[in-house]
């Protein structure tokens, strides 16, 4: 009962994660802030659906189709769709035309991927010029210092992601905190590991970005949540 996730990493530099999810006897979930945009595909009652999900800057409540099976591709920060400026996707999304086995993007029909061939779809999108990425953002994400001004870095980061660098760091840290708490790490340990100022600072971040308290995350309480809490944190 609820949402059952399975998430894996990808060896593609364009992809953050690939995930599947099934919903059972759940009508809504707590959505969790994310710095990534994605492609999501699901089927319900024999009908296929596809959509683009944008980065989310805060938590909220979202409807969930009952008894549906989802496949999702979360793209690496700095990857974007050439036809859709990232800023237009923030806290939003786009529904795509879909049929059994195919969906339409940028005027072209593409085969709907399974979890195992997400990378093949992404490579086709890259070759077609539908997916693009800013190498400067990728450079920054690896911890390198670019030889341009801070203003140029921020401008290009926003253009590539729709978000400020600081917002991305806060969102990613809160998601990591949620997973650590769900995995049993004490609050004090999370504060120390992720360099929050103190426990109230962590509590505010969880409230804003995750929609759960530390106690709820530790106890697995609060209902369905749009985050695979069993997926290990990289922080």
Residue ranges and their predicted role:
Residues 1-150, 160-165, 179-182, 186-200, ...:
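Alpha-helical bundle regulatory/interaction domains
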Residues 152-155, 204:
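Base-recognition residues in the alpha-helical recognition helix of bacterial helix-turn-helix
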Residues 210:
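Short, basic/aromatic recognition patches that contact phosphate-bearing ligands
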Residues 173-176:
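Pre-recognition alpha-helix immediately N-terminal to the DNA-recognition helix
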Residues 157, 169, 206-207, 218:
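DNA major-groove recognition helix of helix-turn-helix
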């Amino acid at each position: 009962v609820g949402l059952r996730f399975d998430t894996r990493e990808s060896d593609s530099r364009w992809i953050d994660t690939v995930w599947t999810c099934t919903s059972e006897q759940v009508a809504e979930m707590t959505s969790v802030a994310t710095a990534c945009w994605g492609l999501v595909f699901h089927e319900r009652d024999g009908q296929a659906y596809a959509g683009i999900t944008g980065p989310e800057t805060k938590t909220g409540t979202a409807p969930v189709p009952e008894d549906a099976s989802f496949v999702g591709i979360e793209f690496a920060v700095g990857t974007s769709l050439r036809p859709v400026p990232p800023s237009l996707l923030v806290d939003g999304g786009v529904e795509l035309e879909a049929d059994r086995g195919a969906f339409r993007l940028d005027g072209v029909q593409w085969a709907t991927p399974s979890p195992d061939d997400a990378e093949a779809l992404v490579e086709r999108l890259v070759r077609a010029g539908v997916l693009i990425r800013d190498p400067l953002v990728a450079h920054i994400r690896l911890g390198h210092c670019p030889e341009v001004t801070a203003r140029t870095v921020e401008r290009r980061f926003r253009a590539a992601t729709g978000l400020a660098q600081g917002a991305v760091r806060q969102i990613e840290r809160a998601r990591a905190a949620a997973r650590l708490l769900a995995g049993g790490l004490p609050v004090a340990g999370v504060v120390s590991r992720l360099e929050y100022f103190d426990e109230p600072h962590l509590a505010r971040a969880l409230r804003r970005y995750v929609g759960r308290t530390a106690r709820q995350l530790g106890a697995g309480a609060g209902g369905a949540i749009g985050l695979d809490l069993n997926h290990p944190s990289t922080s």
